[in-house]
Each structure stands twice: as C-alpha cells, then as structure tokens.
Amino acid sequence: LLLDTLKASAPARVVVVPSKIHYRAKGINFDVLQQQTTSVGQLKEYGVAKLANVLFAKELARRVAGTGITTYALHPGVVATDVWRAVPRPFDALIKKFMMSEEQGAATTLHCATSAEAGAQSGLYYDKCKPQTPSAVSQDEALAAKLWAASEAWVVG
C-alpha cells in the first residue's frame, strides 16, 4: 500500500522489528494462520509471527532492489518495558536487572534507520547494531514468497 510513496521518497528505509524468538519457529502453517485461536501456545505463535516479520523484510528487500528502498529486520534486545507488567513480584524486579533500558533497546532500530553503514545494505537481520545470521527457515526464499502471496490475497479479500 505504501510502496509507491516509498519509491517516490527514495532513499527510504523500512525497519521491521521481529526478535530472536523467530529462531524457535520451525515454519509457518498457512492452514491455521487465519483461524481464531485461544491456544496456550502463545509463545510458539509469537515466534511464528516474528518469523513472518523476518521473511517479510527479506522478501520486501528482494522486491524493491534497485529502487532506493532498503529493508532491515532486527532484534531490539530484551528491554525493560511495560510488556513485562504481568510478571509477578518479586520476579519482575529480578528479571528487570538483566534487561536493557528503553534507550539501549532503541539503539539497533536507530542504527538501521539512520546509519550510513546500514544504508548501504538491504534485507539483513541485525542484533546489537551488527548484521547477524537469522534462522535457517527465515532464509527460505520460497517460504517468503508464499507468505507474501498469501498476505496479498488476505488483504485483497
């Protein structure tokens, strides 16, 4: 929906924020993607959603190559935000000692959005402001293309 605007605004960057949890996803079951779920496997589903984010960034990079649009997927880190508000006391204080601040968590996103170094590359996965190797399944070009086609079909209706 925004591709024409991004192309007209080039150079432009698209920063997608999945997380390391995508490494846990083994693939995408397209038969259940549009079904409503109340499953207890929320972490598994979250991993699949984050895998889809990485695949999207990679497929978008392929589709816009040479247009002045660059794409990035990244792991922001485990950040001490309100997302952890449901963790019971005293565990909340304990785990927050091992988390990074919101400012630290923004570093990789800002790096991908603004740095000259990142601007020269597209379709990469970043962690701690450096390109990293994403999961093997997230590098499956056929799966990325299938997800793109399915997503377009769902949006069109």
Regions found by a protein language model. Give the residues of each.
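Catalytic loop of short-chain dehydrogenase/reductase
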Residues: 3, 7-69, 75-96
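Hydrophobic core positions within the conserved protein kinase catalytic domain
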Residues: 2-3, 109
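Short C-terminal domain-edge/linker segments immediately following a structured domain
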Residues: 43-51, 62, 102-106, 141-142, ...
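Residues that form generic nucleotide/phosphate-binding pockets
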Residues: 33, 97, 150, 154
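Non-catalytic terminal and boundary segments that flank Rossmann-like NAD(P)-dependent oxidoreductase
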Residues: 11, 23, 27, 137, ...
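C-terminal helical subdomain
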Residues: 17, 49, 73, 96-134, ...
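Generic structural signal for alpha-helix termini and adjacent loop/cap motifs
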Residues: 1, 115-118, 157
